[in-house]
Structure formats: structure tokens, C-alpha cells
């Protein structure tokens, strides 16, 4: 049956690896789509895995890499391609934990630092952006001579006008240079999955299974209208929807009303906005309102934020750090590609631990960086592009909404879309 789980102990992996997943990462069973994906991958087939956000795609790739490097083709090399530097760093850190336990070296290729060069040549697993990989293939093709397995994360971006061409050229070149290399493509569900799988000569694994049920709602003039429930097994009938409700607060600031409602239910809110500037200004406005609310209702909580503020103050000072500090005084923060690595790590840890109650972010965060919240609000469904305000692609909105619901912590996630004026709702 496609919906069965599988014990990690039953996997054809070295015992050390199985023990690491169970003891260090607390993973004892595979979700149904993971089990479904592992079967072709462990027989050496290429695969396109198209399953929802936060369903554990990366784990499938890690297991495929370990089987290839430790059992099938010992001494060979893996390449893990990602679209963003922030995502490359996250995957590098996760794989480094694995590498230490299993005696594998991990390299990171995201820029031109001379310190990267040696590790890129000598590593067993190279995590890199498409742009860096393009440079390596052009200038140091010998780096690819021993590659036996290639992972393309966020593979649906092949359809993206700005990032797609580089990824397509890289994969075409790698398939020419290494025709026998196994390819694992990790994708959100897109309309042309069958075509993409055929192009890769890969088996297609497609599923809408989620580890946490998800309720999609529209949010307009403070009126919340649940539209669809996607359960952890399948989409349920509309009869399972919660009744509509009206939130109370200033109509001029619907994001604050959503956050106050979240705070009152001891939750966390992730707000997606269109630009870095919007992320910063929204976080600052919300911080001031949170400070005002907590100073009346729970002043002790304000003290919790001081440790995070101190961590940012202890780093290199900049205008960005000053803005972050102002936001953190009220337990909010912003997250975008303009943050330093250290600032990003501090913010992510504070959000994961529950200290920060609200994070504003650009869609970059939806592309793989693992920061789920019980409630997600997509504030901006349009983007200024080529001199016009254009609607975001449906897939991009789905990626953002898919960050709602924390596996292991929440029974369900709440995915809200803010509708302004006549946004067609």
C-alpha cells in the first residue's frame, strides 16, 4: 500500500547510518511518500520526487547519497545542487552532522572564497548553488570526474525564468559528462512533472500526503473564511472545515490583528511579504504593537527577548543589525537574503525555540529553509515585476502556505491568504 510507513531499521544502509537517523535526528520511521521514493532510489534508478513542502524530501536525498557512497560506489562523490546560498548553508550544516558520524567530508560551494577550493576538490559530498556549479563545470571539470549521484533540490525552479536556465544547462552538461550518474530531483508538485521526469529519464513519485493537516483560509477585511482542509492522508471534504469567523481589531492593520489572535492562542506567525523593505517595516510595526500589548499583559515575557538582542549586539554592528534589534525588543524579526549568516542563525534558532512569536520573510524563506510555524499568512500575493504589479505564481504561494504546521508539534497548520480589495476571492 502506498500509504504505509517503514522502519528506518529495515533500510539497506550501514548500521551506523540507521543508528544516526534514529538517535541523533529522532527519525525511526519513514512517511509514506518517503517509503515510496526510497524503493526506486535504492535500486539505483533516477527519480523525480514531487511531494508537498515539509514532507521530508531532503531525507530521501540524504539516504540515497549514503547508500551510493557507502555501499554501491564506495569512493565516489555526490553533488547536491540548491538555488540559494541560505539553503546551501542549511544543507551543508545538516550533511556535516551526517558526515562526522559516517566519516564523510562535506564541501560548500557558494562563492569565490579561496578556502572553498580545497574542500571542493577533496570532499565526498559537495553542496553548491547552480551558479557555482556552472563555474566549476566550465573551469574545473575534473572536480566532476568522480561524481556518481546528483541531487537537484527545488527542481521545480527549472520553470523559473531567472534561475531555471542555469539549472537546466548544469544538468544537461552533467548528464553528458556522467551519463551513468544517478539523479534525484526534489520538487514541489508542478503541472509538468511528467515531462520533467521524462527529460531526466527518471521515475516519477508524486504524492499530496502531508505530515500535518493543513487548513487553507482567505482573510479579507478581518473575515476569515476556511476554504479547504488537506489532511495528512488526503484532501478532506469541505464538511471538515471550521466555521468562518471575524477577527477583532483595526482594519487598517490586518497583519497585527492576525498576530494578536496568534499570540492569544500561544502560537507563532510567519508572514510572507513581497520585498526585503516590506519585511523590515512590517516586523518593526508589529514589534511596537507587541511591546505595548506585553507591557500590559505579560511584562516578564519582554525580558526573554533581551538574550536574543544581546546575541545580535555582540556581532558586527550595521544598520541591518540595528533594525533587527529594534524588532527583537518586541519578539518579532525579519528574515531575508540580506542578513549575515550569523544573524540568520540567531533568528532561526530563536524562532524554532519559540522566543520569537512573529517572523516576516520574503518568499526566499519558502524555498527550502526549514522554519515552519503553526500559522502562515501570505500578505502579498502580487509582485512588482518588469514595471507592473503581477500575481505571484500559484506554486510559489503554495510553497509559502506549505510552511504552516510543525511536524511533531502541531496537529494541524493554518494557511491564510490576505486578500485586498478585489483580489478575486
Language model regions located:
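Conserved interdomain linker/interface between the two RecA-like ATPase lobes of SF2 helicase motors
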Residues: 172, 182-285, 333, 337, ...
Amino acid at each position: 500500500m502506498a500509504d504505509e510507513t517503514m522502519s528506518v531499521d529495515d533500510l539497506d544502509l550501514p548500521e551506523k547510518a540507521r543508528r544516526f537517523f534514529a538517535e541523533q535526528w529522532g527519525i525511526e520511521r519513514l512517511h509514506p511518500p518517503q517509503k515510496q521514493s526510497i524503493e526506486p532510489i535504492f535500486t539505483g534508478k533516477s527519480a523525480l520526487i514531487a511531494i508537498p513542502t515539509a514532507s521530508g524530501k531532503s531525507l530521501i536525498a540524504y539516504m540515497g547519497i549514503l547508500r551510493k557512497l557507502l555501499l554501491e560506489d564506495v569512493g565516489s562523490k555526490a553533488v547536491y545542487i540548491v538555488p540559494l546560498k541560505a539553503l546551501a548553508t542549511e544543507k551543508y550544516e545538516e550533511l556535516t552532522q551526517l558526515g562526522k558520524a559516517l566519516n564523510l567530508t562535506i564541501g560548500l560551494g557558494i562563492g569565490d572564497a579561496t578556502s572553498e577550493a580545497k574542500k571542493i576538490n577533496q570532499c565526498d559530498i559537495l553542496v553548491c548553488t547552480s551558479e557555482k556549479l556552472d563555474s566549476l563545470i566550465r573551469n574545473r571539470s575534473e572536480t566532476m570526474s568522480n561524481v556518481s549521484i546528483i541531487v537537484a533540490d527545488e527542481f521545480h525552479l527549472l520553470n523559473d525564468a531567472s534561475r531555471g536556465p542555469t539549472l537546466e544547462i548544469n544538468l544537461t552538461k552533467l548528464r553528458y559528462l556522467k551519463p551513468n550518474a544517478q539523479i534525484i530531483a526534489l520538487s514541489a508538485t508542478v503541472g509538468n512533472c511528467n515531462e520533467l521526469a521524462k527529460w531526466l529519464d527518471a521515475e516519477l513519485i508524486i504524492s499530496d500526503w502531508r505530515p500535518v493537516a493543513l487548513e487553507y483560509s482567505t482573510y479579507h477585511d478581518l473575515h476569515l473564511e476556511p476554504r479547504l482542509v488537506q489532511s495528512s492522508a488526503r484532501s478532506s471534504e469541505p464538511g471538515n472545515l471550521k466555521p468562518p469567523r471575524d477577527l477583532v481589531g483595526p482594519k487598517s492593520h490586518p497583519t497585527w490583528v492576525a498576530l494578536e489572535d496568534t499570540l492569544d492562542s500561544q502560537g507563532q506567525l510567519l508572514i510572507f511579504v513581497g520585498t526585503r523593505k516590506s519585511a523590515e517595516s512590517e516586523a518593526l510595526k508589529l514589534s511596537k504593537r507587541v511591546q505595548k500589548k506585553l507591557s500590559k499583559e505579560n511584562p516578564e515575557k519582554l525580558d526573554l527577548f533581551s538574550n536574543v538582542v544581546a546575541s545580535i549586539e555582540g556581532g558586527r554592528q550595521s544598520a541591518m543589525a540595528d533594525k533587527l534589534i529594534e524588532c527583537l525588543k518586541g519578539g518579532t524579526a525579519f528574515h531575508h537574503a540580506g542578513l549575515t549568516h550569523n544573524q540568520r542563525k540567531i533568528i532561526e534558532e530563536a524562532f524554532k525555540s519559540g522566543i520569537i512569536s512573529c517572523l516576516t520573510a520574503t518568499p526566499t524563506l519558502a524555498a527550502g529553509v526549514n522554519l515552519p510555524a503553526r500559522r502562515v499568512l501570505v500578505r502579498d500575493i502580487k509582485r512588482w515585476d518588469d514595471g507592473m504589479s503581477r500575481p505571484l505564481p500559484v506554486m510559489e504561494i503554495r510553497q509559502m502556505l506549505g510552511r504552516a504546521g510543525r511536524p511533531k508539534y502541531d496537529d494541524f497548520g493554518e494557511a491564510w491568504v490576505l486578500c485586498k480589495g478585489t483580489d478575486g476571492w
